UniProtKB/Swiss-Prot annotation:
Biological process per Gene Ontology, one example term: root meristem growth
PPR repeats: 95-125, 126-160, 161-195, 196-226, 227-261, 262-296, 297-327, 328-362, 363-389, 394-428, 429-459, 461-495, 497-529, 530-560, 561-595, 596-626, 632-662
Name under which the protein is recorded: Pentatricopeptide repeat-containing protein At3g26540
Assigned protein family: Belongs to the PPR family. PCMP-A subfamily.
Record gene name: PCMP-A5
Taxonomic superkingdom: Eukaryota
Disulfide bridge partners, by residue number: none
InterPro entries: Pentatricopeptide_rpt (IPR002885), PPR_At4g14850-like_plant (IPR046960), TPR-like_helical_dom_sf (IPR011990)
Repeat found in the keyword field: yes
GO molecular function list: RNA binding
Keyword Transport: no
Gene3D superfamilies hit by this protein: Tetratricopeptide repeat domain
Keywords: Repeat
Native source organism of the sequence: Arabidopsis thaliana (Mouse-ear cress)
Amino acid sequence: MAVTGVSSAFGRLFKQDKTHKRVIGTGTKLTVTRQILEHLEGGNVSKAVSVLFASPEPVSYWLYERLFRSCSSKALVVQARKVQSHLVTFSPLPPIFLLNRAIEAYGKCGCVDDARELFEEMPERDGGSWNAVITACAQNGVSDEVFRMFRRMNRDGVRATETSFAGVLKSCGLILDLRLLRQLHCAVVKYGYSGNVDLETSIVDVYGKCRVMSDARRVFDEIVNPSDVSWNVIVRRYLEMGFNDEAVVMFFKMLELNVRPLNHTVSSVMLACSRSLALEVGKVIHAIAVKLSVVADTVVSTSVFDMYVKCDRLESARRVFDQTRSKDLKSWTSAMSGYAMSGLTREARELFDLMPERNIVSWNAMLGGYVHAHEWDEALDFLTLMRQEIENIDNVTLVWILNVCSGISDVQMGKQAHGFIYRHGYDTNVIVANALLDMYGKCGTLQSANIWFRQMSELRDEVSWNALLTGVARVGRSEQALSFFEGMQVEAKPSKYTLATLLAGCANIPALNLGKAIHGFLIRDGYKIDVVIRGAMVDMYSKCRCFDYAIEVFKEAATRDLILWNSIIRGCCRNGRSKEVFELFMLLENEGVKPDHVTFLGILQACIREGHVELGFQYFSSMSTKYHISPQVEHYDCMIELYCKYGCLHQLEEFLLLMPFDPPMQMLTRINDACQRYRWSKLGAWAAKRLMNDHYLQPP
């Protein structure tokens, strides 16, 4: 395509630099070429470009191309500009393919403006020029320019190639425009590129990012010979959507076809097993990771460790960690953090104390573990140790400190932290600012909360409004909370996350009027009430003793996940309608939903209220035998309460012999009280003696 105004164009961009210093003498072109190649082969691109720039004569076109590619691979934009300058100095009308390489180099170097300017100044362009500038814009996230260039290319009658579509699809994956994606998909088919595996894989990837897994799977199934990348993409997108079962199935299919999974894919599938507590599947994937020799990878070994921790196989988890050959600081921190975030603070602290070196991330992870476990005394002791051992803290440390202040309701300590935050400039960090607001709200100092909320006017976001609203509602000021909620709607439209968080806050307070106002707002503003919000609404109405409303919200759900089922089951127990729990559990099973430990906690509580002793033991036994769920302390506590409440002390004695741990104080107190009530002296004497001693005694 010819472009007029060639002279003016070259005058602006293709600046001919005729001041190249002759520092290499008057050697021949062959000598210059040899020197450049020697530097390139030695990996010194800058010296190679310096030799070129000092040369008073041009080199071969193939050498210019190689220099552009070398600048691209090392992201050397200054050197790329020098190569272009030398090229146009000695070649007033450079060949198009070399200018295309220059555009590619600028794109790889992150200088998309240089790439676009060079493209506009080109006297002639071909399809490669369009591909180069579209790819450069896509690589640098300039999505609007990608689509503008693509439309302009079509208007100019240039046929889009696979490379053009690849760049446009990459940008579509950034903006997640489903309508545009469908148009591009149709265009790919129309242009006859539907057999291109890379393009089809990109389409699968973007459909997955747009959360339309049905279309992603359909396109994947249409790929005649999916590549390794195709398989890894579909597995990862399933995992990101939470479709863990489908992801695991596809993972094993790719293994059957001898497709090697990426390390990241292995770790992601392992994390899916962690989320669903699928121990046996996790063990198989662990064995596969060993066979593929990827278990030494830090990301993979950390995910294996995390799976065993989540599935309560602490010995296996520790074995994985101990067998990791090259344990760096990141490995130690990841393992320790895995324990800490799972509530296993004792095990986490053991690893922390063994760490050969620590950084602020390690300290923060341990402190965060204490905060998550609500172990406030340990957190305070650890803060004292931090003050002695390290000099500098960061914004994460401050957030945990403010959480500790909230947990122990120590507003004076919180104000001291506020002073430190102000003096060191952390008050401009929105996360720290929100944690500070949350601390004032949870400590009940609403005046300080209101003052700080007004001061952070330029910082505040949805989290800020959440903290203020829940803080006001927590002290029973529902009318003020409603007023703030109206103010929030003026400043920013609340997201589903915000509304779900507010509903959860209303449930915990409880604040029925505010909860109803949020429900009404959802309906009036046309929000799609998904399972997350619906679950929060059911929980809110249940805890606010409006269970009929909770039932209606539950029945209106088109689909019900486990969280929603657990909410309604707990609500039945809380509102004196325990008989309905057993019917709900049957419906849950009929819908193919797998119960978890929370579900069984609700069922056992219903058995306590209804006096179903034998049925309670059947449900308790089925946890491990039928559903492969390891009973937790809370489930054992429910069974002991069930036996004690209805005087089934003979069964209680048998049950105690099966318990895998020493009964804590609360259980022993309940057993002792029941034995006194029902005159069961032998077991009562054992419980009383156990309460008075620190060592373990076998039940009689």
